[in-house]
Every structure is written in structure tokens, then in C-alpha cells.
Amino acid sequence: MNIWTKILLFFPLWLLFSVLFYGIVFLIYPESYSASKTEFDTLISTNYGFLLISQVALFLGTFSAIFFVSKVIDKQKPAFLNSMLKPEGLLFGVVLGAIEILLIILILSLTTKTKITFHGFNISILLYAIIFFLIAVSEEAMSRGFIFANLYNQSNKYFSIIISSLIFSLMHAFNSSFNWIGMLNIFLIGIFFCQLYLKRMNLSIPIGFHFSWNLLQGPVFGFSVSGFTTQGILKIENFSGSKFPFEGFGLEGSLISTLVISFFIVYLYITNTRKIMLSEKIEPSSINVAALKAEA
């Protein structure tokens, strides 16, 4: 089947399965069914149980759609399952994500007058860790494991990176306070995640990075995460008391993030031009490690 037909088939299935699983959420929290967007955003920000069940529903909807397309069309299981939860890959991604977030915060502190307030440890961070891990796994499975891998099989590598990253960015278009800088930065993050995936054919690396990026940005340092508000252990604020220009969407809405992410993209591209190990195909359902070759 043509890759575009497969992708166009995937999204309606993703919506269908997500709605079906979300029906359970509506049964448990009937008030969410008729809530306005503002009321819904408030419910997600204040009700941890609702937030967790909602993410589980989306997680199940995403994987149901991926498995349906893979089993019915490709007749095989999704390839990324082989590398999705490798401990060493997750750890590497977590550390790399932490480095980037800390670098962004360091530059922010050096270029603006900031103050850090300690709010104290909140047990809710453990719940947020579960939620952000579910988000990282489901979004990476969809964006890199399914969409990018299938595009890469039937088109140019760079075209595949650009298109899958654009789709990844647009997936966040309905988030609160979404703006063009946020769209650009999520697009750039998508490119970087594709690079990480190609570097070792290991989806656990971008999953670890994605998880670390969100967890540190929100529940640790107190910024919004792609427009989603959380209570942080720390709170980094403008010393004058005024809000940062990017505050509504989070660090992903800042030009500092644009510069840092762009630097890492260029650095990874230059240092790996002759070192990245690529396969001739990223099989949608199985990766033949023996087929890996060095890219010239």
C-alpha cells in the first residue's frame, strides 16, 4: 500500500480508537463530556486522576491504531517494539534531555534577571512521571516509530524527517497558548528526535529525551509544558515580577530553545555525517540489523 494511503488511514483509526477509549473517561468523569475548552484545560490541570486516565486512553488509542495498521496491512508487528524500552537507550535520552533543558535555563538566567523559588517536593511529581512517560512513548511510537519509519522506506531521508517533524509539530496545534515559535521549536525537536532515532536505530533514545524534557520543564522547574500547566518543585520567575514572553507555552515557546535545539541538530549532523549507521530500510515491522551500513 502507498505510504500516504497508509498514513491517511492511520489518523482516522487513531481518532476512532482514542474516542472509544476516551468513552471510559467520560463514564468516570461525566462532567468532562460537556466541558468547554477552558473548563477541560482546568480539569486536566487540577484533577490528577482525570489527567492520568485521559493519557492512558490516548496511549491505548495510539497503539491500537498502530497495531491495526501494522497487522492488517504489513502483516507483522511494529518494528520499534524491538528497541522501544531499552534501558541504556532510555538512560542516554534522559541524560541528554536534562543537559539541553539545563543549558536553556542557564542561558535564560544569564540573559535575564531571574529568581528561583523552592516550592518543596510534591508527591504529584511521581504521577507526572508516569503521565509524561506515557506521553513520550505514545508520541514517539506514532511520530518516529510509525510515521517517520514508513515515510523513510518510500522516500528521501530528509523529506521523511521534514514531513514527520511537521506532523509532530501540528499535533500540538490545539494546545493552550500555541504560537509560531512553539510550532517552530517542536518542529525542530522532531528533527532532532529523528536524528537520535537514526543514530542507533533505537527508539528508546528519543523516548528518554522526550520524557526528561517534559518532566524537568514542568514538574521540576515549574514551566508550562507545551501549554500544559504543572506545579513545579522549583519556580523560575522574572525578577521584575512580569511574565516571560514564552511563559504561556513553556520553554518550547522561547527563542533560546530555538537556538539551543538548532545547535544540537547541526552538531549531531556534522559529527555524524560519516559515522551514523543507517539501514537501507527501516522496516515497518522488523529491522534487519545485518542490513545496517555506514552512510557516506
Positions of PLM-derived features:
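N-terminal, membrane-interfacial amphipathic/helix-forming hydrophobic leader that caps
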Residues: M1-K77, G218-A296
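Small-polar-interrupted transmembrane alpha-helices in polytopic inner-membrane proteins
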Residues: A98-I104, F132, A136, K157-A173, ...
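Juxtamembrane helix-loop-helix connectors linking adjacent transmembrane helices
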Residues: F26-L51, K71-A141, F148-N153, K281, ...
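Hydrophobic alpha-helical transmembrane segments
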Residues: W4-F11, L52-I53, L90-V95, I125-A129, ...
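Transmembrane alpha-helical core residues of multi-pass small-molecule transporters
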Residues: L13-W14, L58, I167-F168, N185, ...
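Membrane-embedded alpha-helical segments of multi-pass membrane proteins
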Residues: V56-S64, I125-I130, S138, M142, ...
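Membrane-interface helix/loop boundary segments of multi-pass membrane proteins
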Residues: S138-I163, I167, Q195-N202
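Functionally important transmembrane alpha-helices
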Residues: G182-S242
